[in-house]
From Swiss-Prot:
Function: Catalyzes the methyl esterification of L-isoaspartyl residues in peptides and proteins that result from spontaneous decomposition of normal L-aspartyl and L-asparaginyl residues. It plays a role in the repair and/or degradation of damaged proteins.
Pfam families registered for this protein in UniProt: PCMT
Localization, UniProt: Cytoplasm
Documented EC number(s): 2.1.1.77
Keyword set, alphabetical order: Cytoplasm, Methyltransferase, S-adenosyl-L-methionine, Transferase
Keyword Ribosomal protein assigned: no
Gene Ontology CC: one annotated term: cytoplasm
Family: Belongs to the methyltransferase superfamily. L-isoaspartyl/D-aspartyl protein methyltransferase family.
Cysteines paired by S-S bonds: none
PANTHER family the UniProt entry points to: PROTEIN-L-ISOASPARTATE O-METHYLTRANSFERASE, PROTEIN-L-ISOASPARTATE(D-ASPARTATE) O-METHYLTRANSFERASE
Main location: cytoplasm
Recorded catalytic activity of this chain's protein: [protein]-L-isoaspartate + S-adenosyl-L-methionine = [protein]-L-isoaspartate alpha-methyl ester + S-adenosyl-L-homocysteine
Gene encoding the protein: pcm
Name of the molecule in the record: Protein-L-isoaspartate O-methyltransferase
Length: 212
């Protein structure tokens, strides 16, 4: 079921769970999540749960998409955001409506190709895609004043820290694959990096190397 009432119930739940950024909530309200999942799962698209998208990947839980987006924007608007892990393209689509430009890296080409098609369908034109190793980021276009990582790393990749602009913010899950991990907010400051642990999460692992 993809009715407006179903979407409104999801927005109400996100608000009750602590998402308070009105712009984030509005973007999630108007973005058709059912386009980002297989047709067989479309009836579950507005449940607050992660869903499989193939290739051992998932579309993230709406709360997590909202929460990570809100954290990224906590200090104000951003004009240049790097996304590690395009996946279904849902988080990408949300970001594209919240920031000026999104640069999205995905290692699984078939997923990225589908995500591109969905964003074109939604007329979101401010996203540039790269097929490659997310652990390496996208150094040629660095620095970024926001980085969002949608897969868990055992530790924060140094390459991503290096690509964060002064004052920039990174939201990333850190910890062992298949176990409870910690969501972290990292801010690049004059004397280094501040790190804030935001709570337990579970994400698929951030893997090396592109995959056709």
């Amino acid at each position: 079921m993809t009715s407006q009432r179903t979407r409104e119930r999801l927005i109400q739940r996100l608000y009750e769970e602590g998402v308070s950024n009105a712009k984030v909530l509005e973007v999630i309200r108007k973005t058709p999540r059912h386009l980002f999942v297989d047709e067989a799962l479309a009836h579950r698209a507005y449940e607050d749960t992660a869903l499989p998208i193939g290739h051992n990947q998932t579309i993230s839980q709406p709360f997590m998409v909202a929460h990570m987006s809100e954290l990224l924007l906590e200090a104000g608007p951003l004009d240049k955001v790097l996304e590690i892990g395009t996946g279904s393209g849902y988080q990408t689509a949300i970001l594209a409506q919240l920031v000026e430009r999104v640069f999205s890296v995905e290692r699984i080409k078939v997923l990225q190709d589908r995500a591109k098609e969905r964003l074109v369908e939604l007329n979101l034109r401010n996203v540039v895609f790269r097929w490659g190793d997310g652990c390496e980021g996208w150094p040629a276009l660095a620095p970024y004043n926001g980085i969002i990582v949608t897969a868990v790393a055992p530790e924060v990749p140094q390459a991503l820290l290096d690509q964060l602009a002064p004052g920039g913010r990174m939201v990333i899950p850190v910890g062992p694959a298949g176990e409870t991990q910690q969501l972290m907010l990292i801010v690049r400051e004059e004397q280094g990096f501040s790190r804030r642990v935001l709570g337990a999460v579970r994400f698929v692992p951030l893997l090396n190397g592109p995959l056709a």
